[in-house]
Amino acid sequence: MASSVISSAAVATRTNVAQASMVAPFNGLKSAVSFPVSSKQNLDITSIASNGGRVQCMQVWPPYGKKKYETLSYLPDLTDEQLLKEIEYLLNKGWVPCLEFETEHGFVYREYHASPRYYDGRYWTMWKLPMFGCTDATQVLGELQEAKKAYPNAWIRIIGFDNVRQVQCISFIAYKPPGF
């Protein structure tokens, strides 16, 4: 046992001396020529664009004449297929879908006070009841079509409610009135 302690101490002393001379100075990035080339050409956007290319593709949200409403509101209007995917996502998470609509202001506004209050555009009218037990995204889309027919000039959003934690987990605009 004593011999193993002595040998490990000797090894530790030897590696400390060797490590100091093994570190090479940094000489910058290596050229791409020295790396092996794979036979598979990966042509997705993440492999083609460099970091600088991605920065040049970014755009700034125009602040004039456009309002930001909810999650995904900066994107073009979602198609029915895209809405179905979003609804399926919230159903797969076990959340309860619910529709809400607003006929006057689809965005947060201050009417009675400069600081946030109860009546400042964050509370919308619920369409019917939350869809407890719903497992089919097309049912939610059908309710959206009914709400659009009943209120064609209203903003309609879909929320996902977690009834265990009692919180709203997802909310996105599903329909905007014409002209918005």
From Swiss-Prot:
GO cellular component, one term: chloroplast
Transit peptide segment: 1-56
One MF annotation (Gene Ontology) recorded for this entry: ribulose-bisphosphate carboxylase activity
Record-linked CDD domains: RuBisCO_small
InterPro entries: RuBisCO_ssu, RuBisCO_ssu_dom, RuBisCO_ssu_N, RuBisCO_ssu_sf
Keywords, sorted A to Z: Calvin cycle, Carbon dioxide fixation, Chloroplast, Photorespiration, Photosynthesis, Plastid, Transit peptide
One GO BP annotation of this record: reductive pentose-phosphate cycle
HAMAP family reported for this sequence: RuBisCO_S_bact
Entry similarity comment: Belongs to the RuBisCO small chain family.
Function as written in the Swiss-Prot or TrEMBL entry: RuBisCO catalyzes two reactions: the carboxylation of D-ribulose 1,5-bisphosphate, the primary event in carbon dioxide fixation, as well as the oxidative fragmentation of the pentose substrate. Both reactions occur simultaneously and in competition at the same active site. Although the small subunit is not catalytic it is essential for maximal activity.
Cited PANTHER family: RIBULOSE BISPHOSPHATE CARBOXYLASE SMALL CHAIN 1, CHLOROPLASTIC, RIBULOSE BISPHOSPHATE CARBOXYLASE SMALL SUBUNIT 1A, CHLOROPLASTIC-RELATED
Name by which UniProt lists this protein: Ribulose bisphosphate carboxylase small subunit, chloroplastic 1
Organism: Petunia hybrida
Taxonomic path: Eukaryota, Viridiplantae, Streptophyta, Embryophyta, Tracheophyta
